[in-house]
Amino acid sequence: MKQLPVLEPGDKPRKATWYTLTVPGDSPCARVGHSCSYLPPVGNAKRGKVFIVGGANPNRSFSDVHTMDLGKHQWDLDTCKGLLPRYEHASFIPSCTPDRIWVFGGANQSGNRNCLQVLNPETRTWTTPEVTSPPPSPRTFHTSSAAIGNQLYVFGGGERGAQPVQDTKLHVFDANTLTWSQPETLGNPPSPRHGHVMVAAGTKLFIHGGLAGDRFYDDLHCIDISDMKWQKLNPTGAAPAGCAAHSAVAMGKHVYIFGGMTPAGALDTMYQYHTEEQHWTLLKFDTLLPPGRLDHSMCIIPWPVTCASEKEDSNSLTLNHEAEKEDSADKVMSHSGDSHEESQTATLLCLVFGGMNTEGEIYDDCIVTVVD
C-alpha cells in the first residue's frame, strides 16, 4: 500500500496533501459498505467522535460500532446491542436528535433491508422506532450525506447484484414524526440506479453517477426541496467520468466526491463541485494519492491544531464562527457550544475509512485531507 505522510495529533495539515491517521486502540477491521459519521461532543466531552457502523467483508456482515475519539486520539469498540447486521446502508443525524445516529436500509447476506434503527451512544443501545407509514422497498442505499434538517431523502438504490430498484420516487423520512412520504416532484428524475452519491447542500440534493447493469452514469442531477423540481445539470469544468460506489460530502458551496469504480478499475481521484457556479474541478495534490477504492465511507471532521508549524491560513478557523454558516456541512460544528474546548482553532478534514479495490483487496486504513 502507498505510504502517505502521517498526521500526528495536534499537527497542522497542509493543503493538497493526503495523510494517514495512525490511531491506536480497537480499530475496525477491513470492511466495505460501512457508514462513517461525525458526532459533535455531548455532555462533558471535549471533542467529538467518528462512528463507523456496520459494513461487511467476504465472510460476514457486521453489527458493530467503532468510535474514534478525536480528543483522546483513540479507537474503541463500543458494545452497542441491537443493530441488525447491515452494509451499504444510509446513516444520518437529524436536527431533532443531534446526539443520535440513525441508519436505514442496506443489506446482509440473506437480503436487503428497509428498516430504520437508532443508536443512543450514551446508553450504547440500538432501538427500532415504530414507523406508521409504508417505507420504501428494501434496498441498498450507501450514503451519510442525504439528510436536511429532520429528513432523510432516499432515491434509487440496489435491488440485486448490479441491478437497481426500478423505483424513481423520492422517499422522505421525517425523524420527528416517524413517517415516510413520497412528495410529488416536477421535472424528470434520474433513471434507476444504485451506487450513486446523494449529497445535501443547503436546500438542494445532488445525485451523481451510479450504475445500472453494466452501464456507468456520469450525469449530475439536482432537486431543490423548496420547489421539488428535478433538474439535469450541465456543469462546466473537469467533470468526473461515469463511476459508482464513490462517496461524497458537502462543505459550504462545495461538494467533494472521492474514489469509486469505473470499468477500468478503482479511482483515487477527488473532485470538487461548486454548487452555485455549477463547475467541476479535479483537485491536484502535492504528494502521493491514496490507493484507489470503492464502497468506502467518509465524513467531515474538525481537526484540533495545537502545535502548528506553519503560518495560519484560511483553512484554520474557529468552529464557533463556522457554525454560523447555514449549510449541511456545518452540522459538523453547529452542536458544539462555548463550553467545549472544540471552539479552539481547528482545520476541517475529509476523513475516509476502508473500502476496497477491484482486485478484492479490502482496506482498514483511515486517510484525511484538508477541505475548504
Curated annotation (Swiss-Prot):
Kelch repeat feature ranges: 49-95, 100-146, 151-200, 204-250, 254-303
Pfam families (UniProt xref): Kelch_KLHDC2_KLHL20_DRC7
Gene Ontology BP term (one): vesicle docking involved in exocytosis
Location of this chain's protein in the cell: Cytoplasm; Endosome membrane
Gene Ontology cellular-component terms listed: cytosol; endosome; endosome membrane; intracellular membrane-bounded organelle; trans-Golgi network membrane; transport vesicle
Composition bias, Basic and acidic residues: 321-340
Post-translational modification note: Phosphorylated on Ser residues by PIKFYVE.
SUPFAM superfamilies assigned to the protein according to its UniProt record, in alphabetical order: Kelch motif (SSF117281)
Location of Phosphoserine modifications: 133
Keywords annotated in UniProt: Cytoplasm, Endosome, Kelch repeat, Membrane, Phosphoprotein, Repeat
Main location: cytoplasm
Region named Disordered: 314-340
Quaternary structure, from the entry: Interacts with PIKFYVE; the interaction recruits RABEPK to the endosomal membrane. Interacts with RAB9 in its GTP-bound conformation.
Function text: Rab9 effector required for endosome to trans-Golgi network (TGN) transport.
Protein name: Rab9 effector protein with kelch motifs
Species whose genome carries this gene: Homo sapiens
Gene from which the chain derives: RABEPK
